[in-house]
Design a protein with these regions (language model features):
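Conserved beta-sheet core of the metallophosphoesterase superfamily
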Residues: 1-74, 104-106, 123-124
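Long, low-complexity serine/threonine/glycine- and acidic-rich segments characteristic of extracellular
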Residues: 70-174
Length: 174
């Protein structure tokens, strides 16, 4: 486990070697509700059962099932034509699928970019930050998909390393 960073990243280095880089509870030095990669303030929870270890990221004030954020078309400066999911505890064993109007569209495409919420927050509030060098940073745990219609219902299902499935829905508007 690594901790002295202001973002969340996970690496599967071998079958028995995994590196967790934890975003801090203090997010962006207490200047924003998210870390620079859009990870909400929170902490890692590890559950041990004999030789088995499970883990998840617990966002402060949110249910354990809140494991990603879903943004509508137009929210992301990097992918304006797409819905975007920020899956902050993602690693290469996770699956990020999407559905449009109930039809399975397959896996979303991973990309590097800015989380829309922290980017917008920093644009509006950085002049009040105690440390002027703080801001949004590019992250690799973003996923996108381009809907076929503008008024479709979008559902995203994220399956973690333990097989837990997390779901978010949104209704697109014209």
């Amino acid at each position: 486990m690594s901790g002295h960073e202001h973002y969340n990243e996970n690496y599967v280095l071998a079958d028995n070697l995994y590196e967790h880089v934890h975003a801090p509870l203090s997010t962006l030095f207490w200047q924003a509700p998210w870390a620079c990669d859009g990870t909400p303030g929170g902490y890692a929870v590890y559950e041990f059962d004999g030789g088995k270890v499970n883990w998840y990221y617990k966002c402060v004030g949110k249910d354990k099932d809140y494991q990603f954020e879903l943004y509508p078309v137009g929210a992301s400066r990097n992918k304006k034509e797409a819905v975007v999911a920020n899956v902050w505890n993602y690693d290469s064993t996770w699956k990020v699928k999407w559905y449009e109007n109930g039809i399975d569209k397959g896996e979303m495409t991973r990309f590097s970019g800015y989380d829309p919420a922290i980017y917008e927050y920093c644009e509006k509030n950085s002049s009040t930050f105690k440390h002027k060098y703080l801001g949004a940073d590019i992250t690799e745990h973003l996923f996108y998909a381009v809907p076929e219609t503008k008024d479709s219902e979008i559902r995203v299902e994220v399956t973690d390393h333990c097989g837990n499935v997390y779901t978010r829905k949104m209704q697109q508007s014209k």
